[in-house]
A protein has these predicted regions:
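Alpha-helical segment of the N-proximal tetratricopeptide repeat
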Residues: 21-40, 44-47, 51
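Terminal, low-structured helical/coil segments at or just beyond the last alpha-helical repeat
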Residues: 22, 121-155
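TPR/TPR-like (Sel1-like) alpha-helical repeat modules
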Residues: 94, 98, 108-128
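Short helix-capping/linker turns of helical repeat alpha-solenoids
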Residues: 20, 32-33, 51-53, 66-68, ...
């Protein structure tokens, strides 16, 4: 019985340390990314993303989406956004909607785009910010208008 308890405790400690190191890797990668040191940021973000860190998956997806520090790869960006979005990260849901709307890294599918945009906007933390940004951008670009029309928020 004591062995089982110690084994459980060891596993819990191991998972906690792994999560902490993923957070540290992400924070270092984000710091480098914000300094526009993309090539240095990518390995840190990749390591954190491999550990399941949703923000690292999103940020690494942005790197592949824009070609920051890596060769642009729409399919890889889509896959990373999807992993992050499945962990309920609104920013990734929004980017996933854009991928489906434009057919970037995946076949264009307006219904899937609409679904992901709505999920992003309904997110308690980030949804209002996304909606405000879209409405502000509407005056400057047709993409924002297209997204707002697609989700029925074009008022």
């Amino acid at each position: 019985m004591t062995r089982l308890f110690l084994l459980s405790l060891l596993m819990l400690f191991s998972m906690t340390m792994s999560a902490q190191s993923a957070d540290k890797l992400y924070e270092e990668g984000k710091r480098l990314y914000d300094l526009e040191q993309y090539k240095e940021a990518v390995p840190k973000l990749q390591a954190a993303a491999d550990k399941g860190h949703y923000k690292a998956q999103y940020r690494l997806g942005r790197c592949y989406d824009k070609g920051d520090g890596v060769k642009e790869n729409d399919q890889k960006a889509f896959e990373l956004y999807l992993k992050s979005a499945k962990q309920d990260y609104a920013k990734a849901m929004y980017q996933l909607g854009r991928c489906y709307m434009k057919g970037k890294g995946v076949a264009a599918n307006q219904e899937e785009a609409k679904k992901w945009f709505k999920r992003a906007i309904n997110d308690i933390k980030h949804g209002d910010d996304i909606l405000k940004d879209l409405r502000k951008a509407k005056a400057d670009g047709e993409e924002a208008t297209r997204i707002l029309t697609l989700i029925g928020k074009n008022k």
